[in-house]
Amino acid sequence: MRGKTIVAIVLVAMLLTPVQAGDVSASQSEPEEDTRQPSKGNASLFVFHDGLNNEWSHFNSSDEDSTEENETREDKDNGVIDIKYRFMMKPTLEKRLNMTVGGEIRGNFNIYYEGDNEDGGNGNCNGDCDWLNITIFKGAAEIHQHTEQPWIAGNWKNIVFSYIVTEEDAVWDSTNDNPIVEVTMKVKGDRTSDFGVLVSGNAAAFGMQLGANGQVEFPIDDSTWSEDFQAGIEEAPPEDTPGFTLVIASAAIAMAVFINTKKPEDDE
């Protein structure tokens, strides 16, 4: 009977002893990381344009499909240039992101324009112009919009803004919350010429730098990269909740006690 008790105790000890899992990764090659996705130490979303009608964004500062000049530009002698760029992340966001509450989402862009873009001024806008607006979207939800008042035409301007993350904005649920940067502006030109001899007025133009010169930095918290967060487990279980191993161990102890107390009955 004493032998049975010893076996039960040994079983308990085995259950309570942590087992070191083997390194299965040694025999498997890890998939190559997509640098267009966010990662630890890489939290900046960059914008790109092919110079035609396609714009996109991702977390790599360069893209071979973007314009070689790293800049997009539109010109018009007479009339309105209506800018509406939607830099949606491509490829789509694969991981869940946990932003630091109280941290700042920071935008940094370089914009150029010529012509008039202010209604009600001394220019030629009559309700058909608009200031520069840069809007950050979390999927379909608008997170923040920055409006920049007009500056002296014919000059580049570094546009910098920030937004403090709230609890409601903290968790970005991968594909459902794919980030988008939207840039809108309306500038108007009134240049006219008389058979190419007499030229009057000013042409309209819009320019925007891309890649490293056009980005949004996110305060991605380190907890983002944990397996629990990626699995949707955002809070650890309460400390007083017994784990599975503890339950099994308790059962084994009870078995040992039962066997030991049964000894007198067996002797009879």
Protein language model annotation of sequence segments:
Residues G107-E114, F137-A141:
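Short glycine-rich beta-strand segments
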Residues S25-A43, F48-H49, N54-F59, E64-R96, ...:
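Proprotein-processing/basic-patch segments
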Residues V101-G102, N117-I134:
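Short coil-to-beta strand junction motifs in C2/discoidin
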Residues M1-S29, A236-E268:
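Secretory targeting signatures
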Residues D130-W131, T135-G196:
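Aromatic- and Gly/Pro-enriched, solvent-exposed loop/edge beta-strand patches characteristic
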Residues T35-R36, N124-C129, A141, I259-E268:
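Long, compositionally biased, intrinsically disordered regions
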Residues G79-I83, M99-I105, N126-D128, N155, ...:
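Solvent-exposed loop and beta-edge segments used for protein-protein assembly and interaction
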